[in-house]
């Protein structure tokens, strides 16, 4: 699998601006920012998390090119709902970490172990999208054809879902879509930045494992670091409060 990057750069940190731009630009226009050399014994991924002060609610994407070069359809994906982050594991190491927007409270994304059932480069929803009347005027930009059939002579235009990777029998999957860091926005699907969905689409095949979990997955390599940072932040806030008289 090839990525449009300098071959000498093995670990990449894609900035939030580049992630947003990628949703509007072609793959050839995507921008990458290299992670600087590691210090104090930290791994590339640990440094990515450490430097992202507001992680996990950030738009930055992490990619380890050396690990991604070894990724196969037997690699697995974890979607952590509480963090609103996704991770690709290769050889039990985090090869990529990215923001997601999963199902809103009214349409929660189901948890559990899944496998990719089907993938399609160009796909459109058969349930959600725009509804037009017989005159061709858009009368509903967020139509749900299961709840309200279109008018006579009208037509339905399903919402585009590029790089579609289906996971469940009732239509939940992963695809390119609007992502807002830390926000659950979808009708149940897992929305991905376009640069990420393109990368994953090239890796996954029928049967690739995808684990959707509410909490951080077992073996998450920076769990201890995250817990310690939360303690330190709580202590800092406590010290900043004015003492009671």
Residue ranges, per PLM feature:
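N-terminal pre-domains immediately preceding structured catalytic cores
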Residues: 2-190, 194-245
């Amino acid at each position: 699998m090839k990525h449009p990057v300098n071959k000498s750069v093995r670990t990449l940190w894609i900035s939030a601006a580049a992630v947003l731009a990628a949703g509007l630009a072609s793959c050839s226009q995507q921008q990458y920012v290299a992670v600087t050399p590691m210090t104090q014994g930290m791994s590339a991924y640990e440094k990515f998390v450490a430097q992202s002060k507001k992680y996990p609610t950030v738009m930055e994407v992490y990619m380890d090119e050396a690990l991604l070069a070894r990724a196969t359809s037997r690699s697995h994906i974890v979607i952590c709902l509480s963090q609103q982050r996704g991770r690709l594991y290769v050889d039990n190491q985090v090869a990529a970490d990215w923001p997601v927007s999963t199902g809103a409270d009214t349409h929660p994304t189901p948890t559990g172990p899944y496998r990719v059932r089907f993938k399609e480069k160009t796909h459109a929803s058969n349930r959600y999208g725009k509804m037009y009347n017989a005159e061709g005027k858009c009368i509903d930009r967020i139509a749900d054809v299961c709840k309200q059939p279109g008018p006579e002579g009208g037509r339905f235009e399903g919402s585009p879902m590029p790089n579609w990777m289906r996971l469940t029998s009732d239509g939940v999957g992963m695809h390119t879509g609007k992502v807002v860091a830390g926000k659950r926005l979808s009708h149940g699907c897992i929305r991905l930045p376009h640069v990420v969905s393109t990368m994953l689409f090239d890796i996954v095949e029928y049967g690739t494992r995808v684990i959707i979990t509410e909490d951080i997955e077992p073996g998450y390599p920076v769990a201890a670091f995250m817990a310690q940072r939360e303690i330190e932040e709580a202590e800092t806030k406590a010290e900043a409060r004015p003492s009671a008289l």
